[in-house]
Amino acid sequence: MKISANSIRTGNILVYNNDLWVVSKTPEHTQPGKGGAYVQVEMKNLKTGTKRNERFSSANYLEKAELEQKDYQFLYFEGDDLVLMDTKHFDQINISKEMLEEKLSFLTENMIVKVEFYNDKPLNIELPPTVILEISETDPVIKGATATASYKSAILENGIKVKVPQYLEIGEKIVVKTDDMTYVERAK
């Protein structure tokens, strides 16, 4: 599917120079005093992992990869792979842990994830937007602390450090965003 250079967004997967590239940073739209407007795009090659900056004229159209998305359930780790099961057909696949990088610690047993395929090859794993985790370490509650803008550090059950409101204690469950690893609210 062709998209305008102005429509490129972070996370888009583009077919460029016969390779697949993922847009890794928010594209910068620039309109210089002389010459035509352009879009500066930082992207990463999905095969080699190399990063590249490209300028595309605002009038350009690029090929956006047509991805098929399927729901999979995470079962367990097997060496350096994740073992996932298709929730519809119950087929199992192995995918490298590297595909999740720093978000690997959010993965819990039986979690439903979205796997994106291009030509029947897994390209990307999308975690749910938020997860519920328990606080395993934090400073004690300060008497009289309210839901103000002051935060303290907390370490969650998966080892991730987040800033949480002063009134939260060890053992409480909180909702955390998986994309930027930030506190959302106390779990209900």
Curated annotation (Swiss-Prot):
PROSITE patterns named among the record's database cross-references: EFP
Keyword annotations of the record: Cytoplasm, Elongation factor, Protein biosynthesis
SMART domains for this protein: EFP, Elong-fact-P_C
GO BP, one annotated term: peptide biosynthetic process
GO molecular function, one term: translation elongation factor activity
Localization terms from the record: Cytoplasm
InterPro entries in the record: Elong-fact-P_C, NA-bd_OB-fold, Rib_uL2_dom2, Transl_elong_fac_P/YeiP, Transl_elong_KOW-like, Transl_elong_P/YeiP_cen, Transl_elong_P/YeiP_CS, Transl_elongation_fac_P
Pfam families referenced in this protein's UniProt entry, alphabetically: EFP (PF01132), EFP_N (PF08207), Elong-fact-P_C (PF09285)
Pathway: Protein biosynthesis; polypeptide chain elongation
Main location: cytoplasm
One GO location term (cellular component): cytoplasm
Similarity annotation: Belongs to the elongation factor P family.
PANTHER family linked to this entry: ELONGATION FACTOR P, TRANSLATION ELONGATION FACTOR KOW-LIKE DOMAIN-CONTAINING PROTEIN
Role of this protein: Involved in peptide bond synthesis. Stimulates efficient translation and peptide-bond synthesis on native or reconstituted 70S ribosomes in vitro. Probably functions indirectly by altering the affinity of the ribosome for aminoacyl-tRNA, thus increasing their reactivity as acceptors for peptidyl transferase.
Name assigned to this protein: Elongation factor P
Organism: Rickettsia conorii (strain ATCC VR-613 / Malish 7)
